[in-house]
Regions:
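Glycine-/proline-rich flexible loop or hinge segments
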Residues: 18-19
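A conserved helix-loop-beta module that forms one wall/lid of the active-site cleft
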Residues: 40-52
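Active-site core segments that coordinate phosphate-bearing ligands/cofactors
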Residues: 2-14, 23-34, 38-41, 56, ...
Length: 257
């Protein structure tokens, strides 16, 4: 988005939500960190201008306006990082809202009106697109676990059919467990060597048991991130779900539980 904004306006800029992930931003005070810039040997003059996500960064250049068929002078706003934008779209703004994204990876995005740092160094402290802050946990394998299990192992793309034998009453009552660390793990373990596995398999275990275990394993990995935040006094008033995994009724129930 920052490159697109540059081509539209000629302004070299970014927003706070995206800049938070660069390790060069003083997230609390919303400015470039002189300490980090000095360590990296980077002059602040070379850094992009910083804007809130809703702030106009400039207007369309004559060239961009002509190519787009729009009038010159149209304002262009900074925009937001992917997870921050998704959170805003799901209503996770203000304080104490949680948006869970189940895509290839999974994120737990908890909004806050004040800046706070995770004392266990397991969650990110970032600026939010609404002008506030948020804690974020990210698991590396979420819906990708289900895709791997269905397409690569079971050789099917009929996800709904495979989940039909799994009723809501069976959730949490399965004796087969799954660790979803197919690509190592980010939050809250920060362990690139972590690996996935099925645990508790018996002679009478079924493919439905294993399918359920995959869904539950991802749900519990998300819960790990939520519990880290709650253990530090972060209150969550409501939560929403987005991403491809949100299409699964079982994951919806698992998230709510």
């Amino acid at each position: 988005k920052d490159y697109i904004n540059y081509k539209l306006t000629g302004v070299h800029c970014t927003d706070y939500s995206d800049a938070s992930g660069m390790l060069l931003l003083d997230v609390q005070h919303k400015c470039w960190s002189k300490e980090m810039l000095d360590i990296c040997g980077v002059s602040e003059a070379k850094m992009p201008k910083l804007f809130e996500s809703w702030e106009p960064v400039g207007t369309l250049t004559a060239e961009a306006a002509a190519k787009l068929g729009l009038p010159e002078g149209v304002k262009v706003c900074a925009g937001a990082g992917d997870n921050a934008a998704a959170a805003v779209g799901c209503g996770a703004v203000g304080n104490g809202k949680c948006n869970i994204s189940l895509g290839t990876s999974g994120t737990v995005f908890i909004t806050s009106s004040t800046f706070g740092v995770d004392k266990q160094n397991a969650l990110h402290s970032f600026d939010h697109a609404d002008g506030g802050y948020h804690l974020m946990g990210c698991i590396l394998s979420a819906a990708s676990c289900n895709k791997w299990w269905m397409e690569d192992i079971l050789n099917t793309q009929d996800f709904g059919k495979e989940q039909e034998p799994i009723t809501a009453e069976k959730l949490g009552a399965n004796d087969v467990y799954y660790l979803p660390y197919l690509m190592g793990e980010r939050s809250p373990h920060n362990d690139p060597a972590a690996r996935g596995s099925f645990i508790g398999l018996r002679m009478d275990s079924t493919r439905a048991d294993m399918t359920q275990a995959v869904l539950e394993g991802v749900a519990f990995a998300i819960k790990d991130c939520v519990e880290i935040a709650r253990a530090q006094g972060v209150e969550i008033a409501s939560s929403t779900l987005c991403g491809g995994g949100a299409k699964s009724p079982l994951w919806q129930i698992g998230r709510a539980s």
